[in-house]
């Protein structure tokens, strides 16, 4: 009887061993695929930072509110000194207000061109200096977050250094009141945003940009 069952038993053992080997091969292949995907994802994430450019020519179409909200959300999660969150972002998509801000920028800086390079929307970054002595740094971090998020979503941005001058004007102060904003607010930046209508290569990085002290 034992001899009768031995061939069947050996067959079952061989089948089990073969199945285990196949499963190991599948698991190994899946592991390799996952590692490869992770490497690609890491590089893609890095490319967001390495390929972002300042855009100074835009298509007239206004991006969807969904896209703009994602960029704004990224801005709200920027670091702030001691977690004070001294920054307020005013998202301007109203064309008349956008044009008014451009005119005020011309008045503050001198000039008569569109200070916003045709971008259909402007994110005004304000900071309350009564909340933090690092309000300017807080604002810079918010703009950086929004610029990188916008690039990741296929949008273009440019930092326009006009907000301080705009909101030192009487007309700028009147806008703050109209928007219901209070506090010791200072204009940090105007981050223009829209669909890019240009592309350009990265300028070479300067020598000794990074100094290592090991």
Feature locations, PLM:
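Acidic, surface-exposed loops and disordered segments
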Residues: 2-10, 14-214
